[in-house]
């Protein structure tokens, strides 16, 4: 029978490495005590958001406001002493400190008035910060403080007043901050600290990219966030493929951005050069009837000149035909994708100007195909080859895009399990009988969790596979499949009917049939089967995005008897009319799980100027019988393992198997 001593002896190599960080019994014991104390703290608050679709202003505001949590803290601290309008103004200062601060200072017409405002505001922010920091250890709060003013903020937040006057103490420190011209800096730092501490973990359940104006701003913010994970959406993986240099993914990304007149983001933010594409487009399509290629526009982002619209439309047509050619090639290379019926350029009757879809033929809305050889429709002409070469080079050499996509790979996955919640963007493909759909890839069968794991691994091949290797090519093709494939867990529909919507007038061909999953996820037993497939008990939750909840028509985001929550509420401006709302945030605190429903957001400029907040309705989904502590979470399991290892290290020191460092600094 193995003893604890046997286990320690087996772990000596690891314990010797651990001893580098804790070189004495005292140091190890101190860390044990610290970790055991952490286990008894309340669980940190988690926020879940999905389907941001590049809508940066709404996302930034919801991130800054912590989905309404910060306003609740302001009201809790100051509700009895401060009028509503003043609380709204203070909340706006916390959300946008660098933008709001100059506006508020302008009101102070004298030095005395400014000093009084500084004093009042600093004290109010300190009180709010003390509240939001109460769930954290002092060490954790210290680690969040900027080095330039961390010591003073630590004193302000953690001072005790048993034997001295609080007002006098605070007054002396705040007065010194103002006197030395540091008030602005301290206000900004306190606002940032409040936002940091209000949300412990952020989960983004897919689709950062799409038609919205600035996905790059969203990714810049997420890269600076202290604790975030991402579950890839189908819009994300096609950008991942584009950054990897996949021609089909590059064309797909360009087609979407041009269809919504958002190519300026590609040019200005990512430095993608569209000059060669524009030149080729004008050469072959400049005189065509471009009526079906005109971009969708947002009046709020206009005005648009005819020249701007023409430039966009002609590139839209050029890149779409290039994309349809490449789709034929990818389908040829990957028969296991089972997409042979979607090589539409090969299904056109060039004499009758019709295309065959299934068993029927339909007239084409646009019959001009000057770059297509009817004898070999998938073949690129020399001009298209040159354009594609330049585009691949531009996407591969975009430093900012590569940083963003590496971040998506580092922080992202097809699914994620944390604290009893299963997170994924699209679906776990199912059949009509409620079982998991079976797919065959590379000679093997996959379904359920195994399919999701396979998709994750092959998606990584497309970016990290060796240059020029078959594995890299296969992975890039698969990233495109994840975008639009029939059994893609990120797509969850029968087909992406892009060709049909462009070229065929009959709306019956535009239908994208949802995976049976979207019927079965209303069934509690089916949701429990999904949870069991991922090793979770039936009391856990599934957090799902991808399909906008039509709340205005009475649809509920709560499915499967409360086991599943759909959190796609339509962040994207284009979906507001469809959903009747402007997004959800799921909030999981130590006491409750709640869903916050957001109303449309006008603009950051108006929010700063008029103290306008996003109106959000809070709906409690579950209330815990007892407050959830860190020891009840996945983090708690990690901490317990850490304590176990440290206790073994202490024993190894006591047995003399690992020598202690002789340093008085470790005596306590």
Please report, for each region that a protein language model flagged, where it lies by residue.
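Feature recognizes metal-dependent phosphohydrolase scaffolds
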Residues: 1-668
